[in-house]
């Protein structure tokens, strides 16, 4: 692999790796290389044809390894079916390591490459599930200073959540953002966001995710993914007609396209908030999704948060369980419910 801890090591490795890439390019297969991580995408109309092409490519890799004096990690070398419905459970692909020496590479249902977990047929569900575990662990560590009655201010908590957590969650989103068109993927991403939002807000656990997003002023996570892809696409002029902003619009003026992108994402968010059946009590108070976004000073207390989300002051609930002497509402009603 690439020499570690050396100043000139990466540059020398690039020169060395170029020889392998030149040989593989003659195979007319797609090659992806980053440092010493190599991915070969073999195409074919049948499993036999794909395995034959992969075998020829791996033969070149093993020959190159012997020439430059590096070994191939067989434990990390796997095969995965990215397209099609071929059954490869328990199957292993035979590859020629050297003249007269045969090895095999096993098929897996998911593989991690450059920090992104890809599943069969380009599914990123395993990657999302891994993000949920990471976020829950990070939020658990921050809860010691993020309490309902005391702790850091909303602005600080919001900065932590977006700066530390959002950056990790959005990693690789330009690759798997298309998965947001599926309801299950959107719900998984929003559940990740919900964990962070609940730690930042002084509200009950039963408050809907849509209401938390508006109360905190945090764009829904699935829209954040599309936005992140559009930002990267605008830099490389790789957006298409299905994205929020196309290349033709970006060409006019970058500043205008950024403004247009923000307007469109908020239009989608506003439409969702108005059409949703959840958080209707808070919708009467905060019908504009931009309210909290544009007013960072807006930091409702625990009692105000209960009122905005429809939980009220809980006087009747507490009275029925004896902590309070009266079930009356502060507004004058004999019973607060």
Swiss-Prot record:
The keyword Nuclease applies. InterPro entries: DNA/RNA_pol_sf (IPR043502), RT_dom (IPR000477). GO terms for molecular function: endonuclease activity; RNA-directed DNA polymerase activity. Its EC number is 2.7.7.49. Keywords: Endonuclease, Hydrolase, Nuclease, Nucleotidyltransferase, RNA-directed DNA polymerase, Transferase, Transposable element. It catalyses: DNA(n) + a 2'-deoxyribonucleoside 5'-triphosphate = DNA(n+1) + diphosphate. Residues 1-118 form the Reverse transcriptase domain. PROSITE patterns: RT_POL. Residues 253-337 are annotated as: Nucleic acid-binding endonuclease. This is Retrovirus-related Pol polyprotein from type-1 retrotransposable element R1.
